[in-house]
Amino acid sequence: MIEPKKSPAFQRILSGYLTFQLKKHFHRIWLDDDRQRKGQGLMLVNHSSWWDGLLVFYLNRHVVKGDSYAMMSRKGMEEYGFFRKIGAFSVDRDSSREVVASLRYAEERLKEDKTVWIFPQGDEEHVEKRPLTFF
C-alpha cells in the first residue's frame, strides 16, 4: 500500500490553483448539506469524472475543514503521484492482502476522527450506469 505523504505547502498551492480552475470551468458548485454532523467520518462518493478527486480535496478544504484522506487505486497513485501530497492512499483490488491493508489504514484514520473518502465503484463510471457495481 502506498501511504500518503501530506505536504501543507503543496496543498496551499493546489488549493489556489484549483479554486481558479473551478471558477473557470464551472458556473457554480452548490452543496445542499443540512445534516448536523459531529466530527469527521466516512464519505462515500460517486466517481463519474476526472474532477472527482480534486473536488473531494476542494470540499474538504472549504466545507469539511478537517484532516482528510482518500482511497485511490494503486495504478492511479502511480500515475498521479501528487495525490499522495493531498492525502491519498492506495488500494490494489487485485491483491486481497493490499485491500485488507488499505481498509485497516482507513479504519485507523476514522478512529483518529479523520475524514476518509472512498469511491466505492472503484472506477470512473457514467453517473447513469446501472446496475451500480462496487469493487
Give, region by region, the residue ranges found by the protein language model.
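Homeobox/homeodomain signature
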Residues: 3-4, 19-21, 41, 81
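Helix-enriched interaction subdomains in cytosolic or periplasmic regions
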Residues: 1-17
